[in-house]
Amino acid sequence: MALRNKAFHQLRQLFQQHTARWQHELPDLTKPQYAVMRAIADKPGIEQVALIEAAVSTKATLAEMLARMENRGLVRREHDAADKRRRFVWLTAEGEKVLAAAIPIGDSVDEEFLGRLSAEEQELFMQLVRKMMNT
């Protein structure tokens, strides 16, 4: 079977197209940063370690990303007074502003791709992805 007909090759191409479109529309915010900001907005003061899943990254990579975001003034982190190993994360006012502007753009990029499928196909697609991820 030709490589162009392999499922994971096509998925990789799809993700590359989506990422290129994302970077064009939101050049100052990566998809992992966006996902982390959405998770923080959903649960202000979230424990840093809980953001690993949202970032789809390692603990070290997440810590580096949050440090960069903190330097940009998008998030603030605080240590737990009782346990310095624990850190909690909030969006700053600037982070809230950036996220508020990014959400409709990110949704639009996603819809540009998902809109190629009917509502039924979108539901089936999500079911199949969840099944393959075993969740």
UniProtKB/Swiss-Prot annotation:
Which branch of life, at top level?
Answer: Bacteria
What the entry lists under Pfam families is as follows: MarR
Which SMART domains has this protein been placed in? HTH_MARR
Family annotation (PROSITE patterns): HTH_MARR_1, HTH_MARR_2
Instruction: Name the coiled-coil region(s).
Output: none
**Domain HTH marR-type spans what residues?**
4-134
Q: Which UniProt keywords apply?
A: DNA-binding, Transcription, Transcription regulation, Virulence
* UniProt-listed SUPFAM superfamilies: Winged helix' DNA-binding domain
Please name the InterPro entries in this protein's record.
Answer: HTH_MarR-typ, Tscrpt_reg_MarR-type_CS, WH-like_DNA-bd_sf, WH_DNA-bd_sf
DNA-binding region ranges: 48-71
Signal sequence bounds:
none
This protein's record includes keyword Transcription: yes
Q: Which GO terms describe its molecular function?
A: DNA binding; DNA-binding transcription factor activity
Report whether DNA-binding shows up as a keyword of the record.
yes
What upregulates or represses it? Expression is modulated by temperature, growth phase, salt and pH.
Chain's role: Involved in the temperature-dependent positive control of flagellum-driven swimming motility and cellular aggregation. Regulates fliC expression by directly interacting with fliC promoter.
Q: What is this protein called?
A: Transcriptional regulator HosA
